[in-house]
């Protein structure tokens, strides 16, 4: 039996660093909600059985009319952290017929620069892998170590072998669910899915990502994202 593909978009964050009262995933960029670009990229990939958006139970900003015509489902099962939201979403995927052997691609709602081409590159690279992996970029900048709360450089860190994690992150549903559960039992709240997979003793792979697939986090990021989204994505 061929494994199916599901997408999971954790969308329960408040965007506290973005400088806006409106959660960043609902801010308008180039005429559309930021979340719209993420959903449109996955909607363009007919390979997916379902795309599930996880929002907070008390989300008062989500308006399905802003995403009319796109294929996705929504569940109000967001948790107190990304890890909790992803875990709850994985459980909800069973409602759509997902099994432990199926693949899930978890993607940040705040990465609107994702493209169908990059999604398909990740799938093509990992569909036969025993573990799965992520899109990422080799670190290009020089890294400085500074003590917490300070501003004095302690040392320069080698960037050799360092990659900056992006999303989507692609793993088997059962493996990822078990890995997150193990991390939770061990008292760890990890910031991405690959960290949970690593914590469980597995070795994810990296697939070359894209600079346009950056995470919108700070106020100045919105102008950059809008400029990128106004331009057609290059095929890759």
Curated annotation (Swiss-Prot):
InterPro entries xrefs: IspD (IPR001228), IspD/TarI (IPR034683), IspD/TarI_cytidylyltransf_bact (IPR050088), ISPD_synthase_CS (IPR018294), Nucleotide-diphossugar_trans (IPR029044)
Gene Ontology molecular functions: 2-C-methyl-D-erythritol 4-phosphate cytidylyltransferase activity
Protein's pathway: Isoprenoid biosynthesis; isopentenyl diphosphate biosynthesis via DXP pathway; isopentenyl diphosphate from 1-deoxy-D-xylulose 5-phosphate: step 2/6
Single Gene Ontology BP annotation: isopentenyl diphosphate biosynthetic process, methylerythritol 4-phosphate pathway
Cross-referenced Pfam families: IspD (PF01128)
Functional description taken from the UniProt entry: Catalyzes the formation of 4-diphosphocytidyl-2-C-methyl-D-erythritol from CTP and 2-C-methyl-D-erythritol 4-phosphate (MEP).
Record-annotated membrane-spanning stretches: none
Catalyses which reaction(s): 2-C-methyl-D-erythritol 4-phosphate + CTP + H(+) = 4-CDP-2-C-methyl-D-erythritol + diphosphate
UniProt site positions, description: Positions MEP for the nucleophilic attack: 159, 215
Site (Transition state stabilizer): 17, 24
PANTHER family in the record: 2-C-METHYL-D-ERYTHRITOL 4-PHOSPHATE CYTIDYLYLTRANSFERASE, CHLOROPLASTIC
Keyword annotations of the record: Isoprene biosynthesis, Nucleotidyltransferase, Transferase
Enzyme class name: transferase
Keyword Iron-sulfur: no
EC number: 2.7.7.60
Sequence similarity: Belongs to the IspD/TarI cytidylyltransferase family. IspD subfamily.
Domain of life (superkingdom): Bacteria
Protein name: 2-C-methyl-D-erythritol 4-phosphate cytidylyltransferase
């Amino acid at each position: 039996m061929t494994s199916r593909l599901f997408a999971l978009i954790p969308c329960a964050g408040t965007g506290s660093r973005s400088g806006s009262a409106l959660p960043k995933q609902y801010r308008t960029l180039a005429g559309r909600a930021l979340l719209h670009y993420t959903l449109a990229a996955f909607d363009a990939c007919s390979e997916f059985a379902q795309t599930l958006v996880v929002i907070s139970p008390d989300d008062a900003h989500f308006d399905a009319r802003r995403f009319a015509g796109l294929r996705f489902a929504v569940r109000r099962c967001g948790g107190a952290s990304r890890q909790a939201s992803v875990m709850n979403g994985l459980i909800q995927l069973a409602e759509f017929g997902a099994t432990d052997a199926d693949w899930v691609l978890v993607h940040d709602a705040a990465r609107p620069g994702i493209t169908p081409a990059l999604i398909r590159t990740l799938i093509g690279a990992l569909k036969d892998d025993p573990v799965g992996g992520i899109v990422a970029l080799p670190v290009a900048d020089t890294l400085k170590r500074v003590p917490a709360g300070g501003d004095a450089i302690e040392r320069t860190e080698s960037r050799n072998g360092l990659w900056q994690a992006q999303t989507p992150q692609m793993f088997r549903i059962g493996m990822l669910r078990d890995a997150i559960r193990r991390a939770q039992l061990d008292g760890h709240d990890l910031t991405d899915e690959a960290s949970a997979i690593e914590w469980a003793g597995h070795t994810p792979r990296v697939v070359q990502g894209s600079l346009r697939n950056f995470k919108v986090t700070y106020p100045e990021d919105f102008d950059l994202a809008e400029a990128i989204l106004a331009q057609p994505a290059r095929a890759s």
